[in-house]
Amino acid sequence: MKYHDITPEMAIGDLVKSKVYGDFGTHIFTDMTPDHWNAPLASYGFEKVGFVPTLHRMEELASTGKNYLYPLYSEEERMSEWDKESPAFLHFPGPVAGRPYAIIIPGGAFNRQWGLVEGMAIAAALNEMGYTAFVLFYRTKQDAVVAKAIEDMYACIRQIEARADEFEVQAGHYMIGGFSAGATLAGEIGSTNFGWKSAGVPKPEMIFLAYTAVRMKDFYAGYTAFPAGHPVHDGAAAFLRRVAGPEITPEAVEPFDLTSHMDASYPPVYLTANEDDHTAPFSNSLTVAETCEKLGIPHKTRFGKTGDHGFGLGIGLEVEGWLSEAVSFWEEVR
């Protein structure tokens, strides 16, 4: 097909306004602020995050006129609980039926979601590798929203499993992963307190965590070490309110400190991050890797020295190729 032009000078808002991307376009960036709406694609790393192939795949799917956006909850549930209206997932069908599938969870500090760079770009690349992928959009922008986001994650898995024949995927066989806050959420599926066992869903065959944030005790330490008005205090406070609620205490934060709730049954893990990450410190990913080593959990890492946060596919960085490596690891351990 003949694709619409995509240039580095185009703004995120131009993509959202375009009709050629259908429902995919409305989920490029949730709860967007003017700074992102007006930002040129070049400012995110035009080639680094794979804008062109991703937008082409979105245009291909939208051009079919089929539905690829699915609400997580029934109409009755959406009517009775106001915040269950927005949670949904996007379906990126792969070229081969009956294969395992992947669920991708974009990040955004539980305040919004960078759906294109940390969701659709990964799904489009997985399609190229022969896999069907689903991009999860969960509840954000509330105090104590992580527990609700975990509920959304399991609602997504249950719906895909129940409709496996319709989606032409292999039930019970999947990889799940996420980026930043999305990785925080994905990681909980293996935890002893919020994990797949308590939710009654199939165990994921592998989890990938990209620049994850799991050391909640460290975020709490930053919150208490600096006074109100200091950027470290205020940034940690905003994040921890969304994680644990308005009463930020060690007791409220502790259940979400992932490595305190991992055991040997945790699924195999693939980790990627950069040492110079200024948003989710590299120590988060390193701690997960060290915990996996200690507990004998199969794991693989692709760490870079530079590249910071939010790199998505990471094309042109030291970590380039991490997704292909993660998929190979998934195929090896499943």
Language model features by range: what are they?
Residues M1-P8, T272, T279-R334:
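C-terminal catalytic histidine-bearing segment of alpha/beta-hydrolase fold enzymes
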Residues G22-A97:
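N-terminal cap/lid segment of alpha/beta-hydrolase-fold proteins
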Residues S74, D218-H261, P267:
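Mobile cap/lid helix-loop segments that gate and shape the active-site cleft of serine hydrolases
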Residues R99-G107:
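Short beta-strand element of the alpha/beta-hydrolase
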Residues R112, M216, D276-A280:
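Acidic catalytic loop of the alpha/beta-hydrolase fold
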Residues A155-F226:
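Primarily recognizes the serine-hydrolase "nucleophile elbow" in alpha/beta-hydrolase
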Residues S265, Y270-A273, D277:
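Short beta-strand/loop motif that positions the catalytic acidic residue
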